[in-house]
Regions:
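Glycan-recognition and processing domains
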Residues: 1-62, 89-90
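Surface-exposed beta-strand/loop patches in extracellular or lumenal glycoproteins
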Residues: 53-57, 79, 125
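Glycan-processing catalytic domains of CAZymes
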Residues: 63, 69-76, 86-93, 97-104, ...
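Beta-strand signatures of extracellular beta-sandwich domains
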Residues: 82-84
């Protein structure tokens, strides 16, 4: 079991040892996986080909409350791994090891905060770069009691540099933070920024494919992306 980091309180809902074999109603893989026996430890590893992946199904009790997935992965060679829920951006993060980042030959952790939108949830580990396979030892999912603001002191609390999140694509609002409305997305995003000591949010008003505002000269797309109960993404746009 992966423990919560220091300072967090919550209830454990699910834990997985990824080296164990599980039934088809709680585990899947696309492309063969293997259980590797290494000096770092035992872990499950996907194929070298991009988009090969394995994933787990788990249940939570209270959609809309903040949760944390604590994931242990091997830092023993070059890897490029995507982590997501298979549907939207609620649980999305990634891992790079090797290359410009010298490997530590140890197990490392991701501590990923997310707001699940369903009781029936999933988590997927996917190879994204050729020859850089996804690999995980295990993970645990917790429902958190709260997400209090970070306790900042001194000059940091009264200024200092700007630190925050810049969206490359307009993928937020209805497709991340488990949100179903713009107000819900903004509230959760601000809660997360305060919790992590960040003070800046940059969101695109124009991107590769066009503006995010009504325009007389160019079609506007992706005003709003929404993940519905059927687990499909829908979007509004102009023509």
């Amino acid at each position: 079991m992966q423990e919560l980091p220091s300072g967090y309180k919550g209830k454990i809902l699910y834990t997985a040892d990824c080296t164990r074999e599980l039934p088809a109603d709680s585990y899947f893989e696309n492309g063969a996986t293997k259980v590797a026996e290494t000096p770092v430890g035992r872990y499950r590893e996907a194929c070298n080909e991009p988009l090969t992946r394995f994933g787990y199904r788990f249940q939570i009790e209270h959609p809309g409350k903040p949760h944390m997935a604590v994931i242990t992965y091997p830092d023993d060679k070059r890897r490029y791994m995507c982590v997501n829920d298979g549907t939207c951006y609620d649980l999305t993060t990634g891992v790079f090891t090797g290359g410009v980042y010298p490997v530590t030959h140890t197990m490392q952790r991701i501590e990923n905060i997310f707001w699940p939108r369903w009781k029936d949830c999933s988590i997927v580990f996917m190879t994204w770069g050729y020859g850089e396979p996804a690999a995980v030892q295990g993970f645990s999912v917790y429902e958190l009691d709260e997400l209090p603001p970070a306790q900042l002191s001194g000059a940091v609390a009264h200024g200092g540099r700007s630190l925050g999140v810049q969206y490359e694509d307009p993928c937020g609002k209805g497709a991340s933070e488990g949100a179903k409305t713009f107000d819900e997305w903004l509230e959760r995003h601000i809660t997360y920024l305060h919790h992590t000591g960040q003070n800046l949010l940059v969101y695109p008003i124009n991107w590769y494919h066009g503006p995010q505002f009504p325009s007389k000269t160019q079609p506007a797309d992706a005003f709003y992306v929404f993940v519905a109960e059927d687990r499909k993404q829908y979007s509004r746009s102009t023509t």
